[in-house]
Each structure stands twice: as C-alpha cells, then as structure tokens.
C-alpha cells in the first residue's frame, strides 16, 4: 500500500492537513515529527494515522519507501519554526538541508511534494510583494526557509 507522508504532522498546520485527509477517507498516513514537546498530543489525539515516524529516523525510512514505490505524496510542513532560535547551524540543517533531502528524493522518484514556506521570508513590510527581489528575512528561521524556497 502506498503512503501519504506528513512531516510536522503534530504541528498546527500538519495536524490540520491530516484532519482534512481523514475527512476524505485517507488513513494511509505516516505522521513524521519530533514529539519531545508532549503538548503536541492535543493536535494529534483525534487523528487517524497508519503510523508515526520519529523525525530523526524519517530520511532513512523515506528512502526505502520511495525506492519501493510506496509513497503517494509528501506534505512537508516540518521545520523548527521558532523565530527566536539563534542556532544558525541547527536551523540550516533542520530547515534547509532536511528540506533539500526530501525534495531530492521526491524528484528522483516522481513523488508529489507540497512544501510550506513562511511569510517571514519577506520581512516586516506593510506591502506584500512576492517578487524574488523583495526578500527581507529578518532572522535565521526566515533565512533558512528562504533558501529552501529558492532550492
């Protein structure tokens, strides 16, 4: 059976994607997240998923599933979203490089990928301009998301 993967599935957006998929009858969902924050139970307790994959084990499992044509699609919502995180190395590894690895695997295996960016890549402007010349990331989180967007 083919799987729908939702990274960041215990977060606000990811859990709502799973809820919508459930409402459409989808149960073949693999929820990927870091559950070190136990309060995330409030987002996932009512969801119907096939299995949970810890974030730190995901890439290895994902490549095996993809190699065996067992992935229907990926919703990549997972990221360190704290705009106050000051560990640039962690943000680049977790948000940028992790996203690139997922994207490369999806491209290699023709797996549809839905990726969530962030409005923070445009900075604190009063006017929205989504042109590629108006990027003003004002913290490391925004910069890591911007690089992933450009990838």
Map each language-model feature to its residues.
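Glycine/Thr-rich phosphate-binding loops of Rossmann-like dinucleotide-binding domains
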Residues: 14, 62, 84, 123-124
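Catalytic helix-loop patch of NAD(P)-dependent Rossmann-fold dehydrogenases
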Residues: 93, 97-101, 108, 112, ...
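NAD(P)H-binding glycine-rich loop region in Rossmannoid oxidoreductase-like domains
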Residues: 55, 60-94, 105
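Active-site loop signature of alpha/beta-hydrolase-fold enzymes
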Residues: 37-38, 80-83, 121-123
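SDR active-site strand-loop-helix element
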Residues: 7, 32, 74-78, 113-119
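Conserved catalytic-core motifs of eukaryotic protein kinase domains, centered on the activation segment
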Residues: 42, 83-91, 124-128
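N-terminal Rossmann/SDR dinucleotide-binding element
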Residues: 2-73
